[in-house]
Structure formats: structure tokens, C-alpha cells
Amino acid sequence: MFLTGVAYGWVADDVEDLVGDNDAVRDVIAQYGGVSLTDSYLARSILTLALIGTGYAIQSVLRLRGEETALRAEPVLATPVPRHRWVASHLAVALGGSVIVLAAGGLGTGLTYGIIGHDLGQVPRLLGAALVYVPALWLLVGFATALFGLVPRGVSAAAWAALAFCLVIGVLGEVLDVPAQVGDLSPFQHTPLLPADDLAIAPPVVLSAIAAALIVVGLLGFRRRDLGGATTT
């Protein structure tokens, strides 16, 4: 992820020249807001990094189902290890690892862009732009966790479908003229598009609360059901 960020940061300084007079490309990039084409490009790049990082987080959550279907979870849970602790150990990897992944992408982008532009103030600016997506990413982690606890047989398909939906909305939503009501279903649409937009505190706080609620739902659901996917009565 750091190297992907480096690539984005490398291009950022030349994006005005690369786009040139291509109005179509300018319009697509400008849809991400900002007072300059460079900021719009950086906002789009950071969003892409966040979506890539979400893939890592979802895969980490889906390891829970993989352990269960491979019959490796049952021997562990037959010991005094509580179910919620077993799930929490996997969630710690997904939640904590996703922060590291996003930070690496933002750091790579900011460091490269800052060095090329002789402005290392871009490092904290773009690092913060990446980390502001953590709540949206965690919401999808919560969604996958809730599915694992309630309807485990469909968790993989539904979790990846949710990410694919967010990807289409985030990258192509404006181009495809997706209705706002549909686009708003993506948590990433409620995250400030830094550095093009101003920071708003309320959306990340609300997204974090929803993510926490979904994780609790998943933990409670897993406690009530049998291993293998059946639900206890």
C-alpha cells in the first residue's frame, strides 16, 4: 500500500500537465471537489487507497468463516476460550491492520508528493486524509462481522458485494449519474474527501458508532448459533 501511495504522490505534482486541455478528464477529476485539480486528484487517489484497504480488512474478517468451515474453530472453542474472545482476536487484526494499511498509503502519497514539491507539510495533510476513512472502512468490517454472526453462509458473497458497490459508487458514481439516494448507501460517500473538502467531524463519528453496533450484533449472533452456520433455538 505504501508503494501504491508513492505512485499516486509521484503523479500528483504533474497532474495538471498530464491532463492538459483534456476537458473530459478534468471534469471527471474535478467532481471530487477542491480548489485545484491536484487536490481533486489526491482526494480521488486517497479514496482508492481506502477502498483497497477495505479489501484487506474484509479478507481478515472472512478468515473467521474460513476457520469455521475448515473445522479449525471447533477445537479451539471447545477449550475455555470464549467465542467473543476468539472473534475479537480476528477483529483486532482487521481493525488494527486496516489503520496501518491506510496510514501506509497516506504516508507514501504525502511523502512522495511533499518531497517532489519541496513541501513536507503534505505528509501530515495526506496521512490525515487517508485516516479519515477508517470509520467507513470499519463500518464494512462491522457489516461483515454481523453477517458472520447471523447468516454465515452468505457472508463472503455479501461482504465482497458491498465492497464492489462502494467501489462503483466511489469511482464511477458521478460518471454513471447514480441517484444520490443509492450513492448514500456507501459509507465512503459520507466521509470528507480530503484534501479537496473541509474536515467534518460528525460523519466519521456516526460511522464509527454504526460500525461498533454492527460488531456487537455479530458477536451476539455468533454466541447464539451453532458452529457450521445453524442457529440455536
Language-model segments: residues:
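Long, hydrophobic alpha-helical segments
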Residues: 40-64
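Terminal transmembrane helical anchor/hairpin motif
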Residues: 7-33, 158-233
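Extracellular/periplasmic helix-exit of transmembrane alpha-helices
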Residues: 4-23, 54, 104-115
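A structural motif at transmembrane helix-loop-helix junctions in multipass membrane proteins
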Residues: 134-168
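Membrane-interface alpha-helices at helix entry/exit sites of multi-pass transporters
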Residues: 82-95
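Secretory targeting signals
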Residues: 92-145, 205-208
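Hydrophobic/aromatic residues in alpha-helical transmembrane segments
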Residues: 11, 54-57, 104, 108, ...
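Transmembrane helix boundary and interhelical loop/hinge segments in multi-pass membrane proteins
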Residues: 58-77
